[in-house]
Amino acid sequence: MEYTKYAAVGHFKCHRTLDCKKYPVVIVGRKEYMLDVQEMTVWSSLAWRILSRSQIAEAYLKLTRGLSFTSRRTLDDCIDRLVTRGLVAEGHGGSEYESLYDLLSCLYIAPVSANPFLRFGAFLKLWIWDGAPFSKAIRLFSRLKHSAEERQIVRLANQALLSSAELIKCAERGVRTLRSDAQLMDCLYDDELTTSENLPILMAASRQARPVSAAIANLYLHKQIVFERC
């Protein structure tokens, strides 16, 4: 049996037209992407969630209840389109953990707390688009207690844009502070064979893979980070 997991990539931002009408965009790697209503609904159902395709369908039905829009695309086609556009990530595996690792390993980590624009965009997404009560959305600005692994991930991710696989290798090497780009390269790519493309494969067998992956997933589910691409 193969498992598949999905998560949203990037962060939400709300723009205004000249006549003051609001429209949402998703920003990934400093590039803005326009989404139609169906795409935005699917992306929103995955923001700070890690879901299977059937779970996406349930969340999508809940979000579209009461909305009056039609789309010629099926939900499956919409999900596939978002994956192709790089706005949704997917991971496959023979177990729940393997699919989670495959999902996370190539994604980059951006702490929401490090960027006030990310945090404010996340607040707007919850309040305006998702319709969450103001009192619930404002909790995004409160600080949660993190585990030691989570604190270390946030500390390193505040110093450099790192993928999950790179964070696993940092944990394996005991790196707690990044003093320079040279130190980072020496830690991550200290031989001729290791590249950013094959590092996720190499780190899958690391003893740090499970605890770091679990910590990253927990940070994401608690709205402390967003996923990025380079």
Task: Give the positions of each predicted feature.
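A short, structured beta-strand/loop element
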Residues: K21-V26, R30, L35
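Short, flexible segments with low predicted structural confidence
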Residues: K13-C14, I27-K31, R139
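Long, charge-rich, low-complexity alpha-helical segments
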Residues: Y33-C230
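N-terminal leader segment of winged-helix/HTH proteins
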Residues: M1-C20, A89-E90
